[in-house]
Amino acid sequence: MRKSILVTIVMILSSCQMNTSDDFLVIGHRGAMGYVTENTIASVEKAIDLGVSMVEIDVFRIRSGEVVVFHDDRVDDLTNGAGEIEDLYMPDVLALTLQGGHKIPKLQDVLKAVNGRISLNIELKGANTAAKVNQIIEYYSLHQGWSLDQFVISSFRWDELEKMRELNPEVAIAVLTEKDPLDAIPMAEKLGAIAINPWYKNLTQEAVDAIHEKGFKVYTYTVNEAEDIAQMKAMGVDGIFCNYPDRAL
């Protein structure tokens, strides 16, 4: 009898801690980069086809002022070109071909393609990206059918997040960190952020609980294997970034 009561208590506690599929956010990482070349319109479309409600993309501001969707500092590994992405002008970017024959899109290209069907997590990869990105999302919110609450702005560059908050008091912000997740709490509080996004390998149950106690969501990256996905759900995180979104949906 005592054993059955104990088992029941454990099951109840586990169910209280674990996020269910209804409140667990699966974010397509760079679209669905496990299937299609990352940060391309095709990759974003693949993630949408798989059923995500949010996609994460990375952006840089290039030398000619445009905001392009790309992850690496240099174009060498993913394209037929070479050099730092921030040093390029738009004609240089248009001349590049990504793996799989894709092209590097501008942020506006992705917004036009998505057309408000899902939410978008825009990670500010490069310096001096906040102002231009804010200008773009405000325009699309006011004039192109998007809602501001469909955007989340995240970055490891906390100074860029500070600039974004100065420019836009309302847009949702998430603080990215690859270090101790608890160290991000003061910045999240300063920014009025909605979430802290830590590397899953640095995440502990204590950290998840502490972040939740402060009122922030926990969206952790990049979780691809079934065992790790199950572990994150059991720890009560609010969502994950995943290269293969269908594995977690």
Give, region by region, the residue ranges found by the protein language model.
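Sec-dependent N-terminal signal peptides
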Residues: 4-13
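Phosphate-group recognition and catalysis centered on beta-loop-alpha active-site segments
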Residues: 14-249
